[in-house]
Amino acid sequence: MMVIVAWQMYDITRSAYDLGLVGLAQFVPALALCLIVGQVADRFDRRLILVGCLLVQFCVALVLIAGTLGGWLGRDVILFASLGLGTARAFQQPTQQALLPALVSRDALPRALALASAAMQTATIAGPAIGGFIYVAGAARVYGTCAVMSLFAIAMVCLIRHPHASVAREPVTLKSLFAGIGFIWSR
């Protein structure tokens, strides 16, 4: 959906600057929230975080459908939608990555990580291509497809039966915010 939003922005405004703003609005949340999302993924039920992210994507798709069909979709709405998508993705990706090791055995983890990586790469390549083919029939159809897929993904996440391992609710400190960076740096 993120690529289609950019295409529609360009179709509406014919401005490369506005197209760049869409990319910026989608990227800035990941940068701004990078220290916080790890804390959230570690402290709360990852399934609920994923459902929340998918609900945001579903709602954004509905707004984009309504705006496209109603003829009121413009630059500001697209930028706000891009910011919403970027924020949802900022929480979704790290949460998905943190959930997988909790779902499979230690022995199966390397294969599961390889499969998840292959699936993500396939989706990254095929998603925009398929979206482009659907976009020919109209942007609202792409957003409708994304809305349906979001609901399907929510249903699949709700089927995950993994007890949430509760983390001690220590106060969030600067040290805890930077702990993830320290862990990565030590590797």
Language-model-detected regions and their locations in the chain:
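Alpha-helical transmembrane-bundle signature of multi-pass membrane transport and export proteins
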Residues: 1-187
